[in-house]
Structures are given as C-alpha cells and as structure tokens.
C-alpha cells in the first residue's frame, strides 16, 4: 500500500510504500503489558534496616502491676520501646527489598507490542479515541520529508506544524495541561501535562531543539522508539509524524 509524502508546506511531493509493520493486528493487551513493564523497571527496590527500632535493652514485667504488658526499658525512664506503637519502635510490616516489583514481558511479546503500537498510529478511530484533534491532518500515517529533521527554530516548527495540520492538537495539549488536583502538588507532581504529537525521525539533526518547547510534543529517533512513546498511559493511537528515513528504518527492522 502506497501513501503520500508531504513537504514542510503540507503539499504532497511523492509516494512511499508502507512497511508491513503498519498492518500488524491490534493487540491492546500486549501493549498494556509492555508499557507497565517499562514503568516498573524504573522503580528502585527499597527496604529498611532489619535492626531498626530493635536496638534497645527491654524487659516485660508481666501481669499484676496495673501496667500494660509491653516491652519497657530496664533503666529509668521506663517508657515503652521496641514494639510498633512505641516511640522509636520497629515498624510492623516494613518494605522489603525481596518484594517483586518488576513486571516482566517476553521478548517476542514485547516486539509484537511495539509493532502493534506502530500500526495503531495509522488507525483513525484509535487516534481519535485517544483524544487527538486530526480534523486538518491530511493522512495517517503522516509522513514528511527528511528536511524536518534539520529544523532548529521553534518559530519555524510552529509554522510547519500548522501547515501539516497538527497544530490544533498542540493547542489542545497546552489547554489540558495545568496544576494537578490533590496532594500530588506537594510531592513533586505539581503539573499534569497532556501528550500531543510524536515526531519520529531517522536521525536527530536539530529537530529536538526546534520542537522541545511545544507543549506535549516529543521527538524520538526511530532506533530508540518504545511502546511508551506510542502508547502513553497504555493507551495506543498517538498522533505521530514520521520522516521518510524513519519509515525506511522501520522497513529494515520489522519488514
């Protein structure tokens, strides 16, 4: 199947044969597992000192003294110690480094998940269901000449995105971003940022500098492409712009 290739003015300048990866069956179950595996592998195991709260010489005085039968210090002041509800006592169920926190996925399943996520970027229904505005996008998948990789100025990329029809989605991402509700504001997660278009290039020749200041826009080299780029939050169908060299590299990697 052949699709059009567009220049930086949004005009078709040729055609290209789509790689077979764009016809991979939709597998939302594998995509979800792959994204969660990516999330959990960024978590660092944590634990507590096994002796924390236990470095005390205590005794239990037993019953018959009109006092709670808890461990107390042997020397004055004879306050409670060691037990979980005492000041400086141990924790009841502390976190342990042995806890299994990583979700694993088989290599072939991970590869199929990535291929399925790539194919989902060409599905109009999935892209709309994800919330992207594609009314002015000429086609999906949107393929652009390699000149896009060399643009280094934000004002230039803004005009290019307007001509390619993806600027409305960037505006949507800006309007949906804002201060988070709840306690997360105090815990290093003050702002919620919506995801906008993804730019996939064959080689970074300056486009990262030109696109990084646009709200919600991400740029990634095709060799570093992951399921999390294509399906943020486990939801496939992200609006994606491909360069010609990225498409050719996909053909080499996935057929």
Curated annotation (Swiss-Prot):
| Domain of life of the native organism | Archaea
**InterPro entries for this protein:** Ribosomal_uL4 (IPR002136), Ribosomal_uL4_dom_sf (IPR023574), Ribosomal_uL4_euk/arc_CS (IPR013000), Ribosomal_uL4_euk/arch (IPR045240), Ribosomall_uL4-arc (IPR019970)
Recall the GO molecular function terms of this protein's record.
Answer: rRNA binding; structural constituent of ribosome
Note whether Ribosomal protein occurs among the keywords: yes
List the Pfam families hit by this protein, alphabetically: Ribosomal_L4
Instruction: Show the SUPFAM superfamilies listed in the entry.
Output: Ribosomal protein L4
Please list the GO biological process terms of this entry. translation
Gene Ontology CC terms, in alphabetical order: ribonucleoprotein complex; ribosome
Quaternary structure? Part of the 50S ribosomal subunit.
Q: What is known about what this protein does?
A: One of the primary rRNA binding proteins, this protein initially binds near the 5'-end of the 23S rRNA. It is important during the early stages of 50S assembly. It makes multiple contacts with different domains of the 23S rRNA in the assembled 50S subunit and ribosome.
- NCBIfam families xref list: rpl4p_arch (TIGR03672)
UniProt lists the family membership as follows:
Belongs to the universal ribosomal protein uL4 family.
HAMAP family in the record: Ribosomal_uL4_A
Q: Which PANTHER family match?
A: 60S RIBOSOMAL PROTEIN L4
Name of this chain's protein:
Large ribosomal subunit protein uL4
Organism (species): Pyrococcus furiosus (strain ATCC 43587 / DSM 3638 / JCM 8422 / Vc1)
């Amino acid at each position: 199947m052949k699709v059009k290739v567009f220049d930086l003015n949004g005009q078709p300048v040729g055609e290209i044969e789509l790689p077979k990866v764009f016809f991979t069956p939709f597998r939302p179950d594998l995509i979800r597992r792959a994204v969660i595996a990516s999330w959990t592998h960024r978590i660092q195991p944590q634990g507590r000192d096994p002796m924390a709260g236990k470095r005390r010489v205590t005794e239990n005085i037993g019953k018959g003294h009109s006092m709670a039968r808890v461990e107390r210090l042997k020397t004055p002041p004879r306050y409670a110690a060691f037990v979980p509800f005492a000041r400086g006592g141990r924790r009841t169920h502390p976190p342990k480094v042995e806890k299994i926190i990583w979700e694993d996925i088989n290599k072939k399943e991970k590869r199929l998940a990535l291929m399925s996520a790539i194919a989902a970027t060409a599905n109009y229904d999935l892209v709309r269901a994800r919330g992207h505005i594609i009314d002015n996008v000429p086609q999906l998948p949107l393929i652009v000449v390699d000149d896009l990789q060399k643009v280094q100025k934000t004002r230039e990329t803004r005009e290019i995105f307007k001509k390619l029809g993806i600027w409305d989605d960037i505006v949507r991402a800006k309007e949906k971003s804002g201060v988070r509700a709840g306690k997360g504001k105090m815990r290093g997660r003050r702002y919620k940022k919506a995801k906008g278009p993804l730019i996939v290039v064959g080689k970074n020749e300056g486009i990262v500098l030109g696109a990084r200041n646009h709200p919600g826009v991400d740029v990634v080299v095709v060799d570093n492409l992951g399921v999390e780029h294509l399906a943020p939050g486990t939801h496939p169908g992200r609006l994606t712009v491909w360069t010609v060299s990225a498409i050719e590299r996909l053909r080499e990697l996935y057929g």
